[in-house]
């Protein structure tokens, strides 16, 4: 692949998994993805019904019960890019995304940082895990208030969808968690970034409660990268 294409793909991946400026801040990654100035807006919370509150409680209990997770992912962006790979999660705070060839992308969250590694470009990008949308999934206590605001809850047949935004920076985008219902299982998440690019990350072959090597979540050094 050409270096120009690899750089383009790097920016797309950052936008997709990290949510670009969403939950990060305009000055952090906007230069990478060429974002324009983002106008502030007020977050509008959904008017909660009794059923909404019950479902949010169910989701919180479900997510908190997932201590480890392993599976695959299929990533589809509204700009036409499709990628796949493997995902590993160890709560709280640890994630790993391994992209399938020909991409050379690796992402690791070690509890503090979320690190993007492009081996072909020999480039590494660090952001604080708490500034990314995925930090919500791996925090020890799942809370649908405070830093995040629930803006929509929908229930298509057999599905539960919950959309959240950053409470203090809603203009930067949203993440929607999509679950199959009865039993409750996380199936995918959908990120809409500040440039209105929509990215869906579908989970496949998910296993939970399995033993994972702690080294999966160790940040690579020059010797082992």
Spans of model-derived segments:
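An acidic-aromatic
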Residues: 86-136, 205
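Extreme N-terminal tail/first-helix region
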Residues: 42-63
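Surface-exposed, polar helix/loop patches in the mature regions of secreted/periplasmic/lumenal proteins
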Residues: 118-164
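Sec-dependent N-terminal signal peptides
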Residues: 11-26
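Gly/Pro-enriched, hydrophobic low-complexity segments
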Residues: 145-149, 155-225
């Amino acid at each position: 692949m050409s270096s120009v294409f690899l750089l383009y793909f790097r920016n797309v991946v950052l936008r997709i998994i990290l949510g670009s400026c969403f939950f990060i801040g305009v000055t952090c990654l906007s230069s990478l993805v060429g974002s324009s100035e983002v106008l502030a807006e007020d977050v509008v919370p959904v008017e909660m019904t009794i059923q909404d509150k019950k479902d949010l409680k169910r989701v919180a209990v479900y997510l908190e019960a997932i201590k480890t997770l392993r599976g695959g992912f299929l990533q589809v962006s509204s700009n036409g890019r499709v990628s796949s790979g493997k995902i590993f999660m160890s709560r709280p705070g640890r994630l790993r995304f391994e992209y399938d060839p020909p991409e050379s992308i690796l992402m690791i969250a070690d509890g503090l940082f979320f690190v993007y590694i492009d081996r072909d470009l020999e480039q590494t990008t660090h952001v604080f895990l708490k500034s990314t949308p995925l930090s919500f999934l791996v925090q020890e206590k799942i809370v649908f208030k405070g830093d995040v605001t629930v803006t929509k809850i929908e229930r298509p047949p057999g599905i539960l969808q919950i959309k959240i935004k950053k409470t203090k920076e809603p203009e930067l985008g949203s993440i929607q968690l999509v679950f199959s219902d009865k039993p409750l299982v996380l199936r995918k998440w959908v990120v809409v970034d500040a440039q209105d690019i929509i990215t869906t990350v579908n989970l496949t072959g998910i296993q939970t409660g399995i033993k994972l090597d702690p080294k999966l979540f160790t940040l690579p050094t020059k010797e082992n990268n």
